UniProtKB/Swiss-Prot annotation:
Residues carrying N5-methylglutamine: Q151
Gene designation: rplC
Assigned protein family: Belongs to the universal ribosomal protein uL3 family.
Post-translational modification (record): Methylated by PrmB.
Top-level division of the source organism's lineage: Bacteria
GO cellular component: cytosolic large ribosomal subunit
Claim: Isomerase is one of the keywords in the record: no
Biological processes annotated in GO: translation
Purpose of the protein: One of the primary rRNA binding proteins, it binds directly near the 3'-end of the 23S rRNA, where it nucleates assembly of the 50S subunit.
NCBIfam families registered for this protein in UniProt: L3_bact (TIGR03625)
Protein name per Swiss-Prot or TrEMBL: Large ribosomal subunit protein uL3
Self-association state and partner proteins as the record states: Part of the 50S ribosomal subunit. Forms a cluster with proteins L14 and L19.
Amino acid sequence: MRSGVIAQKVGMTRVYNDAGEHIPVTVLRLENCQVVAQRTEEKNGYTAVQLGAGRSKVKNTPKAMRGHFAAASVEPKAKLVEFRVSADNLIDIGSELTAGHFVAGQLVDVTGTTIGKGFAGAIKRHNFGGLRATHGVSVSHRSHGSTGSNQDPGRVWKGKRMAGHMGQTRVTTQNLEVVSTDEDRGLILVKGAVPGSKGSWIVVRDAIKSGTPEGAPRPAAVRAAESK
């Protein structure tokens, strides 16, 4: 099991394949994505790597985190994410991951925070059909209707779909295809839409349902810290 990467959503565009068909893609950018810490079975009881991405001003970084970054000899990061990995896929601290970590044609799982929509009704939030246009219905055409049963249970069931806050939730979209990568510019082009707004942090992993393709680099496609 390999590590994933932390990327930033740039936006959407389209590219053309060899047949001249256009493919809608989301552009993800890797910015200064480095290994900040390791978790080992002997010391922590599990195996993982902690990645950091982006840049944060020193004055805005808590003192404890400054020491954490200094121990890894990396500059303060804007985003930290921990990835579970197998023991043979541990990555050296300070190494920088590149867009070549993924190969064209492979499937990935993408996690992000969806765009917040504020308070929304049942029709917009859950695709309800609403009430009838006439025949006794007035002023409540877009309401969700009955929410309960009878004297028993005498309450509204937990999880009942009703109006409420829509969006701004952690969502994972599975099995998105990597159309292409640009290692020099740190870009990953993923087919289709990715949850989150422009500029938001996105976590990209090998698709759990399809596994890691044979051509993917192990333990990762890295650029050694000292070569920068």
